[in-house]
Amino acid sequence: MVIIKRKFFFQQKNAIVHFGGGKVEEVVIIDALRTPIGKYRGQFNQVSAVTLGTTVTQALLKRNPMLQKEVQQVIFGNVLQAGNGQNPARQIALNSGLSYDIPASTINEVCGSGLKAIALARQAIQLGEAEVVLAGGVESMSQAPYLSQYDKQTDSYSQPKPVMIKDGLTDAFSGKHMGLTAENVAEQFTITRQQQDTFALYSQQKAAEAQAKGYFVEEILPVEIAETVYEKDEGIRPETTLEKLGTLRTVFKEEGTVTAGNASTLNDGAAGVLLASKSFAEKHQLPYLAVIKDITEVGIDPSIMGISPIKAIRSLLERNALSIDAIDLFEINEAFAASSIVVQQELAIPDEKLNICGGGISLGHPIGASGTRIVTTV
């Protein structure tokens, strides 16, 4: 959901479309920035989620110095918070040089966390609680700890279990891995392994082409670690072929269709956006990247969670009297190819309008940061 240069966009969980009328304060995106996305235990293995977020916000404030004293709230999404210390958003705010007086909130809505942070920022501005808000998302899947449960009666600890799996990648209701929700979708909508591998191949090809043409340069903040500068998404695989994808074993179900190649990857990264009321931007003659026109949020059966964009997009189209043809580009998070294929099919989205620079399968999916990353790329 962001309108840029009179074009319309939809994203995975929240959607923003243009509509006319109304006296509600419009909200604009002044600036947006992200780190490169690192592989699991890759280039950002030794960098915490808080540090990644701080790196982005410091750069945003440096690029927009007049806004440093105007920020009135900080809202960041972060899923794997264990071990990060109290309120990562507050740490990011103070580490970035913002005033102690500015409140900060950390949001956990799993993969929707980064988008929810932006939605809450918009609400705060529209309610008159703030004129400028810093929002974003952070995640270090590499640094997510293992936890043991202590039994006082036996004075013993349980076998350590990864927080990443427990809190980030397992359905709390069924106790099953997120990958099995994709298998559910594939079975329910008859999505084949060949279809999923083909979708994954196209994602890799689009991301590789976008990277080669420099499409990500303006949105990526180069990050220096131990005198090495990282400025590209680490997980893009331009050498991917359909044949290679076909050799991969299924991960979650013996006779299933979901593999490591047609699912999103484990990643580290951060993204941030500076939002302001349109009247504030115009009063101070601040250029802006986009106008947020509308947001909606939906719930869905968690056993098929990945197809929620269908409901969200249909809801917004109906509410704003628009059709699919009226939308120029769609950005839908690629948690799993199976889910993305169903969304595209059910909404009849043309290939040339969908995730034109790749998505979670190719770029990576640092869960708490992905929502903001999508907005930043748009």
Task: Walk through the language-model features, giving the residues of each.
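N-terminal extracellular/periplasmic Venus flytrap/periplasmic-binding protein-like
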Residues: 34-35, 46-55, 63, 195-283, ...
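Short, well-ordered amphipathic alpha-helical segments that serve as non-catalytic structural scaffolds
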Residues: 49-65, 88-92, 117-120, 178-185, ...
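Active-site-proximal alpha-helical scaffold in enzymes
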Residues: 107-139, 186-215, 273-279, 344, ...
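Conserved beta-strand-centric core segments of catalytic alpha/beta enzyme folds
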Residues: 6, 16-56, 113, 117-155, ...
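Conserved beta-ketoacyl condensing-enzyme motif
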Residues: 45-112, 116-133, 138-157, 220-232, ...
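Conserved catalytic cysteine-centered active-site region
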Residues: 78-131, 173-177, 239-265, 346-378
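A glycine/threonine-rich phosphate-anchoring loop and its flanking beta-alpha core
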Residues: 159-194
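Glycine- and Gly-Pro-enriched alpha-helical subdomains that act as flexible
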Residues: 278-326
